């Protein structure tokens, strides 16, 4: 192999209802990436038990994510859609990466600090090792690119650190087995087995905020359902949530600079821009000077027109669980085949008998 074959990997946790932020920040980007890339999209159910071990309906949540992928336009025939626990090689490589990674690296992860809170001693070991499993998810396929939000950027940097340490520690074994690719890290040439993964960050609305508090990210775990637009919400519910969305008393500005220190206004304008594939400046050129009583109905109509086809197809798919299960099963078979190719070579590189 002279170079790493380009491959996109990403995953979504099956925890709670998917919402507009998940769609605009992740799933819509997945759909666009599949046009010109080889893609693997995963329902990361092993990650879902790191913070909450017992789920009321984990199978239903897994199917819901898969349905959202497909309803949004991801093609499970051309690309791979599967659930993580169906491919045991993820967990196998994660254990190896637990031995590669340093405890100090894990302790620096801000997401662990945020999720563990003040009671760090009571957090699960799985939550601490979450980034190691994420690295395995990506590298078990030797993926080269990962679409991520800002909140996962640090984890992706850790993935690169783990890959680099493995490559350097086992460089002679990799070279001897004829498995690697010659790359340059910094100014240092190395013979690498795992690629230096690149993040794909951006898009018009990578961070959609709560409809009730523009300083907080839209979240599945927010106790108020009015804080988010769920992908399964019907048109009337979407209209109600946008009508009740928190705003300020001032009119919309005519320029984007006027949104500074107005988080709720900036959030709603950003959502409109993302749904319409326009810039905030273009949206404000149309609505600047108008009150939210005019803007909110326009935003609601746009949201309904974009999301209703997805919602309808999700409902249809969720009514045929056998079809979703068949897609996940076939995707799992294809993913296992690729993952086992990697793990066979990793075992050889490390020196495990097979």
From Swiss-Prot:
Domain of life of the organism encoding this protein: Bacteria
UniProt catalytic activity: tRNA(Trp) + L-tryptophan + ATP = L-tryptophyl-tRNA(Trp) + AMP + diphosphate + H(+)
Binding site for ATP: 13-15, 21-22, 149-151, 208, 217-221
Short sequence motif 'KMSKS' region: positions: 217-221
EC top class, as a word: ligase
InterPro entries, per database record: aa-tRNA-synth_I_CS (IPR001412), aa-tRNA-synth_Ic (IPR002305), Rossmann-like_a/b/a_fold (IPR014729), Trp-tRNA-ligase (IPR002306), Trp-tRNA-ligase_bac-type (IPR024109), Trp-tRNA_synthetase (IPR050203)
GO CC entries: cytosol
Coiled-coil zones: none
Keyword Protein biosynthesis carried by entry: yes
Motif 'HIGH' region in this chain: 14-22
SUPFAM superfamilies per UniProt: Nucleotidylyl transferase
GO biological process, alphabetically ordered: tryptophanyl-tRNA aminoacylation
GO molecular function, one term: tryptophan-tRNA ligase activity
Alphabetical UniProt keywords: Aminoacyl-tRNA synthetase, ATP-binding, Cytoplasm, Ligase, Nucleotide-binding, Protein biosynthesis
Pfam families: tRNA-synt_1b
EC number: 6.1.1.2
Gene3D superfamilies referenced in this protein's UniProt entry, alphabetically: HUPs, Tyrosyl-Transfer RNA Synthetase
Subcellular location: Cytoplasm
Binding site for L-tryptophan: 137
PROSITE patterns, per database record: AA_TRNA_LIGASE_I (PS00178)
Major location (coarse): cytoplasm
NCBIfam families per the UniProt record, alphabetical: trpS (TIGR00233)
Subunit structure: Homodimer.
Functional summary from the UniProt entry: Catalyzes the attachment of tryptophan to tRNA(Trp).
Entry similarity comment: Belongs to the class-I aminoacyl-tRNA synthetase family.
Name of this protein: Tryptophan--tRNA ligase
Organism: Rhizobium meliloti (strain 1021) (Ensifer meliloti)
